[in-house]
Amino acid sequence: MNIVITCAGKSNRFKKEGINIPKFLLPLGESTVISNILDTYDDNDNFHLVITNKQLDQNPNLKSYLNDLKKNIYLNIIKDHNLGPTYSAIQAKTCESKKDIIISYCDFLIDWDYKKFK
């Protein structure tokens, strides 16, 4: 399965409250939001994360952190934009398959039975 996760948002509301890291990097339990999202899927899935060059500039260790989360992480680095998560998902050029794709946001968690879904 190919999992496209759009992480390219600007987190404007969080920044207004003084939180200056991307939402997907916020701590959640003993980990981060993105780590918890990835854990809802199978380790053998392909994870296509879409992030911006601006996020990389502001978080120098971001690339290595994301690559260390799972073995099949594919980063799609795009320019900062205001076009929304659908635009970001379309930019996941590492996802060449036209089938078996799940598109997920990076800032919500769901409790579901992924094995039943597959």
Question: Where in the sequence are the language-model features?
Answer:
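Conserved N-terminal catalytic core of the sugar/cofactor nucleotidyltransferase
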Residues: 2-5, 13-15, 27, 31-103, ...
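Short alpha-helical oligomerization interface
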Residues: 19-24
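Conserved donor-nucleotide/metal-binding helix-loop-beta segment in metal-dependent transferases, i.e.
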Residues: 113-118
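The conserved beta1-alpha1 loop
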Residues: 8
